[in-house]
Amino acid sequence: MASGDFCAPGEGVEMLLQVCGKQFPPCALTEEDLIQNPRFSKLLLSLSQHVDESGLSLTLAKEQAQAWSEVRHRKTAWLRYEILQRVIQELLVDYYVKAQDTNLTSEDKKFHETLEQRLLVTELTQLSGPGQETELPPLLGLERTDLLELMPPSQDFVWMKARLQLEVEEQLKRKCFTLLCYHDPSSDTDGDTLKAAKVWTLTEVLVREKQQCLEAKSQQKEQLVLLEKKRTTYSQVLLRCLALLQRLLQEHRLQTKSELDRINAQYLELKCSAMILRLRMEELKVLSDTYSAEKVEMHRLIRDRLEGAIRLQEQDLEKSRLVLHTYEALGEDFESLVREYTQLRLAADNKRWALQELSKAQR
């Protein structure tokens, strides 16, 4: 394919612009850029076949997806363990609070004491167990076998485990209902069966709402980019219109010879000047909206330095003109003085050279 025909205006350019907008967002290319640089356009089209919408290569994107999948899997496992750990801690805290206010039954006391003992021994066993990088002395001088002896009886553990499952399920159920009522306050008056049905689909609802939020955020970003482009275009068009109006006003000023016409011309001139000032004010307003205060201040500094340099050059030029006028006023007498000074300078140089040679000969 010829380079001149690669990016001819049409559907090919539109397709390439869409590809660049999705896969190469920092480029911000225009249709004119693609038409004027066909080889670069061909390079972008070739690169688009090897990268995804985020700009990553397909291989790297696949590896990243696998890594994120592994991270999500490990995060899910950790969250399950962390949730169970926190629920058990909350059960123990509730037990301590109830023990201060009410008299608990013997079964409740036995359940919480067995749970606390089992949890404490398990944590100490993990701290003193293998799997550490460096050899550390036993915790408090206790070996793993010493800690295992502190475990509650097996029949108590089996009974506690069966009840713990019910307690954890009830605690998680209350938390799920609380989350559901926070997300949908109207569900507060529903029955447990209806709440359980809504909780079952709550995950899908949250995922769908999150996806909608992400899509809305992406659309908002695209709209902001489009709005910025339109704002720049409208500002440029408005500036051209203001310049055209100013030129038309200056070209069509009325000029008359009579006094009345002169007064009318002065009035129209003042009116045009006011209009020009107003147009200038609008132009400055558009420029202030287009350029930031830092850019305006930088332009002002550059202009001040250039004006200062111009003034210095004009002063040097004026001094040079004065010296030139002085030399021109002297005329032929000044030229004779220059020739005489040149002869004396040459004679002095010759005598100085002779003295140097004589001194060398004497040494």
UniProtKB/Swiss-Prot annotation:
<comment type="similarity">
    <text>Belongs to the HAUS4 family.</text>
</comment>
<keyword id="KW-0132">Cell division</keyword>
<dbReference type="GO" id="GO:1990498">
    <property type="term" value="C:mitotic spindle microtubule"/>
</dbReference>
<keyword id="KW-0493">Microtubule</keyword>
<dbReference type="GO" id="GO:0070652">
    <property type="term" value="C:HAUS complex"/>
</dbReference>
<dbReference type="GO" id="GO:0051225">
    <property type="term" value="P:spindle assembly"/>
</dbReference>
<dbReference type="InterPro" id="IPR026214">
    <property type="entry name" value="HAUS4_met"/>
</dbReference>
<keyword id="KW-0963">Cytoplasm</keyword>
<dbReference type="GO" id="GO:0005813">
    <property type="term" value="C:centrosome"/>
</dbReference>
<dbReference type="GO" id="GO:0051301">
    <property type="term" value="P:cell division"/>
</dbReference>
<dbReference type="GO" id="GO:0005737">
    <property type="term" value="C:cytoplasm"/>
</dbReference>
<dbReference type="InterPro" id="IPR029327">
    <property type="entry name" value="HAUS4"/>
</dbReference>
<keyword id="KW-0498">Mitosis</keyword>
<keyword id="KW-0206">Cytoskeleton</keyword>
<comment type="subunit">
    <text>Component of the HAUS augmin-like complex. The complex interacts with the gamma-tubulin ring complex and this interaction is required for spindle assembly. Interacts with EML3 (phosphorylated at 'Thr-882').</text>
</comment>
<protein>
    <recommendedName>
        <fullName>HAUS augmin-like complex subunit 4</fullName>
    </recommendedName>
</protein>
<dbReference type="GO" id="GO:0007098">
    <property type="term" value="P:centrosome cycle"/>
</dbReference>
<dbReference type="Pfam" id="PF14735">
    <property type="entry name" value="HAUS4"/>
</dbReference>
<comment type="function">
    <text>Contributes to mitotic spindle assembly, maintenance of centrosome integrity and completion of cytokinesis as part of the HAUS augmin-like complex.</text>
</comment>
<keyword id="KW-0131">Cell cycle</keyword>
